[in-house]
Amino acid sequence: MVQITKGKFDGLQRLSNDKGVIAALAIDQRGSLKKMIQQAKGTENKKDVEDFKQLVSEELTPYASAILLDLEYGTPAIKARHEGSGLLTSYEKTGYDATTPGKLPDLIEDLSALRIKENGGDAVKILVYYDPDEPAEINEIKYAFLERIGAECRAVDIPFFLEPITYDAKVTDSGSLEYAKLKPAKVKASIKEFSKPRYGVDVLKLEVPVNFKYVEGFAEGEVAYTQDEAARHFEECSDLSPLPFIYLSAGVTSEMFHKTIQFANQHNVQYSGVLCGRATWADGIEVYGKQGDDALREWLRTQGKENITSLDKLLDEGAVPWWTKYGSFEDVHVVEKQ
């Protein structure tokens, strides 16, 4: 049995579908989305980013249990979301200071967990870049930072979703074969660390532990892992986490993310859903940039809808309810926050 405070429990339920699976859409990208729209449209305008997010939210949240948004460009999209769709809100600043070692995280100055909750957020989401092999003087800053977020979320009784993005300080190309060989150990180390109760994380938003571009049978060139090795990494990560976890799409294509989730399903991985971003809507950026709002709306109602509903089917086949890590639904004991 596990005890969960009422605010956290209610938030998790609002973010989940009727099976307890988090089938969520992510569009909290800020700097990267601004650049993509600018390249497609040839102009830079905050309203373009807001409008794109709003259209995606309006058209696709009927097929998502929740949406992840930011308050910098996402307020119109928050208002436009489907009535039954929960809301995760980003708390961290976009990107990191490249002039300082360690990819250190920072928070949006005029935001707090309380303000996120007051704004209708059902959960706080934090992204942190993490290399378990970096010096302690860098990682201790990140650990203390996340301990503070966990305490803040506990204080206002809102779920804390943590997204650790792994990297290697010495191997700068995260898409390389060299990094692909390091990635499984990095992801496992991040699960071990951030599952510790001291951080107060409720759900881990995880990268898949391998780069599918280098998995035998998926790779077009060099191979970093056999399919059996890839399956073992998935299973070990699943077993390592005492917390519910969901997968992020990490900028891959819709086709590749679908194959990834199929692979997880085939190997009985205990994941509780996805937060899928660019894999669902990225191809709509070119349409929006060149042809405008109406063309994007049409794309979202056809290809965008197909991307998200076909992913929903895969989740129906393989994802487990968020409470599975604690046993059954009856094993979750909801208590009032003291």
From Swiss-Prot:
Biological or metabolic pathway of the protein: Carbohydrate metabolism; D-tagatose 6-phosphate degradation; D-glyceraldehyde 3-phosphate and glycerone phosphate from D-tagatose 6-phosphate: step 2/2
Q: Does the keyword Lyase apply?
A: yes
SUPFAM superfamilies the UniProt entry points to: Aldolase
- Entry EC number(s): 4.1.2.40
Q: Name one Pfam family in it.
A: DeoC
UniProt KW keywords: Lactose metabolism, Lyase
Record has Signal as a keyword: no
Family the entry assigns: Belongs to the aldolase LacD family.
Name of the protein described by the UniProt record: Tagatose 1,6-diphosphate aldolase
Task: State the species of origin.
Answer: Listeria innocua serovar 6a (strain ATCC BAA-680 / CLIP 11262)
Whichever gene encodes this chain, its name is lacD
